[in-house]
Each structure stands twice: as C-alpha cells, then as structure tokens.
C-alpha cells in the first residue's frame, strides 16, 4: 500500500472582501484546493476571481 500523501486541502479567502464595504454583494469569497506541504511549506497566495467584488483579487490561504 502507498504511504499517506503529503497533499492537504486548503481554503483560499479573498483579501479585499474583508475590508471593502462597497462591493457587489455581501459575504467573503472562498475557494478550496490542494497543495503539497513538502513542496509548498509557506502560505499560498493566488489571484482568483471574486464574485462578490466582481474582479480578480488576491486570495490567501487560511488556517
């Protein structure tokens, strides 16, 4: 049998939704994805589309 993998499921949250009050609709945009914790030891930051802000924003990994 294979060893338990190094891949974990993480949540990415929009950084502008927390501070921006003038947005399209209320709430915070969240995406889930996986990462290999051996190769990517730090927190991930990706630019993804936020439907609440209606634009591409930086999404940071949450704990």
From Swiss-Prot:
InterPro entries: Ribosomal_bL33, Ribosomal_bL33_CS, Ribosomal_bL33_sf, Ribosomal_zn-bd. HAMAP family: Ribosomal_bL33 (MF_00294). Belongs to the bacterial ribosomal protein bL33 family. The gene is rpmG. GO terms for cellular component: cytoplasm; ribonucleoprotein complex; ribosome. GO terms for biological process: translation. It comes from Gloeobacter violaceus (strain ATCC 29082 / PCC 7421). GO terms for molecular function: structural constituent of ribosome. Keywords: Ribonucleoprotein, Ribosomal protein. SUPFAM superfamilies: Zn-binding ribosomal proteins. PANTHER family: 50S RIBOSOMAL PROTEIN L33, CHLOROPLASTIC, LARGE RIBOSOMAL SUBUNIT PROTEIN BL33C. This is Large ribosomal subunit protein bL33. It holds the Pfam family Ribosomal_L33.
